[in-house]
Amino acid sequence: MAVTVETLEKLERKMTLTLPVGIVESEVQSRLKKLARTIKMDGFRPGKVPMNVVSQRYGYSVHYEVMNDKVGEAFFNAANEAKLRVAGQPRISESEASPEGEMAFDAVFEVYPDVKIGDLSTAEVEKISAEVTDSAIDKTVDILRKQRRTFSQRPHDAAAQDGDRVTVDFEGKIDGEVFAGGKAEDFQFIVGDGQMLKEFEEATRGMKSGESKTFQMAFPADYHGKDVAGKTADFMVTLKKIEAAHLPDVDGALAKSLGIEDATVEGLRADIKKNLAREVKARLLARNKQAVMDALVGKAELDLPNASVQAEVNRLMEGARADLKQRGIKDADKAPMPEDIFRPQAERRVRLGLVVAELVRSNNLQATPEQVKAHIEELAASYEKPADVMRWYYSDNNRLAEVEAIVIENNVTNFVLAQAKVSDKALSFDELMAQN
């Protein structure tokens, strides 16, 4: 089969393919004969339908099928022989000029780019660090105590204050009409916990049981309830009950209730520190990995295949629709989504993927079985039965592939950090936790 390849622009190529007519017709006849042995048609016994009838009924569709198969096979064989790395699917059309006895086709497609990565020793990366402090452990202990707090009714003349659980009836109106979700009876919340909007909490703070109050509340413009977002409502609230919170003591009983094996405060704090350290490590890795990837992309020169970018745009759009559907949005699959919204993120993902792949290939940064095992062991260590978790990962190739991808990213991160100009920046525990 004769093949010619023409460069159209940047990554776009045009390949002209020729197929002997005899090969196509021979395959068409072969498939029609196989079909004739199995099809059932009125007026004929099974397997006894005349070939001319079979050809008349199915000839066009079989010919179309054969052409697709043969041209596709010819294209990818030719691309492999020419050592072309094809990005996406080719656009194939019949050529106007066909040699006698042959059919010619033009395939227009893109190839993956040659990736040029600059001198990584000049790349600048800010590497952050953070430690688990006693203050962070104290705050976690307080959170655990709050999760196990109990409540008792306060005296009738007591005023609601932060930490109290209050029971209220309320009714909110916009332009004189009660809005959806604007009315409730025997509704409970903790004053000061941030469950309610600030103005609502301020209105109930200081009220006593049996008191009623009217007030105005402005909903934020980005409020999740779109019908009331950015609008001001008139509220009437009646406070029916106030309950004081009682936190458990920090002692062996609390430790035991939290599953600490030795049921001691020291054991509880050690367990909290271990869990917080795991979270700190994960966040530092993610942040530093992001900084490395930003630096890596900045040092690379390459053109992006439009086919790859479009495929990534489609994936992002599908993910966005799935998220809307999961949140109960009606007709999420029909929601208008301009592609331009997703294109910058898609381009970055494709660019980063190509750059990382080149760095891995040229520096042998593939994941080793030992690295994969070590990573899975680290993941499994936080579970009650690590051996079961290990088996769960190794029982599925897709899960293993996900771990391998993470290990490769870690290898790339360590490789770049070893060569780049790295500046260290220490963050407090709270600063690290506050960042997304």
UniProtKB/Swiss-Prot annotation:
InterPro entries reported for this sequence: PPIase_dom_sf (IPR046357), PPIase_FKBP_dom (IPR001179), Trig_fac (IPR005215), Trigger_fac_C (IPR008880), Trigger_fac_C_sf (IPR037041), Trigger_fac_ribosome-bd_bac (IPR008881), Trigger_fac_ribosome-bd_sf (IPR036611), Trigger_fact/SurA_dom_sf (IPR027304)
Coiled coil start-end: none
Domain of life: Bacteria
EC code: 5.2.1.8
A GO molecular-function descriptor: peptidyl-prolyl cis-trans isomerase activity
Span of domain PPIase FKBP-type: 163-248
GO cellular component: cytoplasm
GO process terms (BP): 'de novo' cotranslational protein folding; cell division; chaperone-mediated protein folding; protein transport; protein unfolding
Catalytic activity entry: [protein]-peptidylproline (omega=180) = [protein]-peptidylproline (omega=0)
Pfam families registered for this protein in UniProt: FKBP_C (PF00254), Trigger_C (PF05698), Trigger_N (PF05697)
Compartments (UniProt record): Cytoplasm
Keywords: Cell cycle, Cell division, Chaperone, Cytoplasm, Isomerase, Rotamase
Main location: cytoplasm
NCBIfam families: tig (TIGR00115)
Function: Involved in protein export. Acts as a chaperone by maintaining the newly synthesized protein in an open conformation. Functions as a peptidyl-prolyl cis-trans isomerase.
Domain remarks in the Swiss-Prot or TrEMBL record: Consists of 3 domains; the N-terminus binds the ribosome, the middle domain has PPIase activity, while the C-terminus has intrinsic chaperone activity on its own.
Family per record: Belongs to the FKBP-type PPIase family. Tig subfamily.
Annotated protein name in UniProt: Trigger factor
Gene field: tig
